[in-house]
């Protein structure tokens, strides 16, 4: 089974891209889809209705959505394989820029909107720098100069990334992506690990402590003016 992880900020066009991939590959591959989100998601319903493919969704609840994705992915891969799928597509919530959801197998695709601003790639960290492919959407809504600046910014963050520009609603210029999916290796689920390093650790805010100010917290902390070495860890 092949695997595709699609990440990107909200409203960048991730689901529109998933629909184009499904529409173009469904005749040759059986596709399964998992949506990971926080509060509400309807993408699984839309894809099941439009393409009659097996779909599921997971709400992360109190977990970071990408942490939740790591937690459920083993079971999700087993579910997709048991569904007889040749291609498993996972769409992340796109909310945690530090916790890149990509794996060391399969393909990782980041979806970026042309109208998100030219500095967006620099702010997105590992979501861009660890992706295999960047799909830039809504190219019909910006000028050629803006497109070129955005492309340059993406290349500065990740010089080796493959860049594709598209209007995902119409599916223009995506044939290269379809070919890459076809040619990608099948995953070995028992050997899957995250492509990048996760954040340093869990802070006391993550586990529910509400007080404001580092003095009230312990573990991994951060001060306004402290150097990294002295603000990295504080005992109870």
PLM feature spans:
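Short, structured coil segments at secondary-structure junctions
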Residues: 50-51, 104-105, 129-130, 157-159
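Inter-motif core of Ras-like GTPase G domains
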Residues: 92-116, 123-132
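Structural beta-sheet core signal
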Residues: 33, 110, 134-136
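Short, surface-exposed amphipathic charged segments that create phosphate/polyanion-binding patches used
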Residues: 69-74, 172-185, 204-209
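Short, glycine/polar-rich helix-capping loops at beta-to-alpha or helix-loop-helix junctions
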Residues: 41-45, 119-124, 146-153
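Canonical P-loop GTPase G-domain recognition
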Residues: 133, 140-195
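P-loop NTP-binding site
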Residues: 2-16, 21-26, 184-236
